[in-house]
């Protein structure tokens, strides 16, 4: 009973957080600014995505991540980092397509969810990308395939564990494999120059190291810089 009450308490608190984020996002969007969320837990940006989906029906999401995050719940928690995109795709009809890149830790039910989505979820699994590279495909070609799957208006959701584990050793769930920093930069540059418009973004799951270890924060800050640049470049501001 205590466990069920605790789960219900956390789920209710999570919904309040989403409401707070949505309200803050509304104020930012009303000013004409580009909204961004810096998590914590990858569930953090749900409120922002919800607000954007109301204003930009038909939008797409580019998810860079080690995990699919398509579980219907995780140990009873409906709003955990493992369920963010299940919640997005089942609750937000304004999101036309989810394009996942770098996925390499995924459950059978998540694969079934992708297969049942009728193309609404497009997953570029990390190993499949590498297999194509080993067969001779360039990273530019792969990036263009990824971007081609996105609609005109794009939200970028970046979980730091989408990178190789040496770049984010303190994140909560690092996974072998992943994208190199220059590969991410190239993907974001091509996205910005593709004619698509970045309408917002998030960066989540960056975890600090020891007080004298700035590596994780340094990598996270550089990713944030690139995300902001991608959004501005897509709008011809820079």
Walk through the language-model features, giving the residues of each.
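Conserved alpha-helical scaffold segments that buttress catalytic/binding sites
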Residues: 1-238
């Amino acid at each position: 009973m205590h466990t069920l009450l605790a789960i219900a308490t956390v789920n209710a608190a999570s919904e309040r957080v989403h409401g707070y984020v949505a309200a803050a996002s509304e104020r930012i969007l009303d000013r004409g600014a580009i909204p961004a969320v810096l998590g914590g837990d990858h569930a953090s940006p749900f409120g922002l995505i919800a607000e954007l989906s109301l204003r930009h029906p038909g939008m797409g999401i580019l998810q860079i991540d080690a995990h699919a995050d398509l579980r219907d719940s995780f140990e009873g928690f409906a709003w955990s980092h493992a369920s963010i995109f299940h919640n997005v795709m089942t609750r937000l009809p304004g999101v036309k397509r989810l394009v996942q890149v770098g996925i390499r830790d995924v459950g059978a039910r998540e694969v079934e969810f992708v297969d049942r989505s009728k193309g609404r979820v497009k997953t570029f699994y990390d190993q499949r990308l590498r297999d194509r590279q080993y067969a001779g495909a360039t990273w530019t070609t792969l990036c263009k395939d990824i971007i081609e799957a996105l609609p005109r208006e794009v939200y970028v959701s970046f979980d730091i564990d989408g990178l190789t584990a040496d770049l984010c050793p303190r994140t909560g769930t690092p996974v072998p494999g992943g994208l190199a920093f220059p590969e991410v930069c190239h993907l974001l540059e091509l996205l910005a120059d593709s004619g698509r418009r970045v309408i917002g973004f998030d960066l989540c799951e960056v975890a600090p190291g020891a007080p004298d270890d700035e590596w994780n924060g340094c990598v996270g800050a550089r990713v944030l810089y690139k995300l902001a640049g991608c959004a501005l470049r897509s709008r011809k501001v820079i």
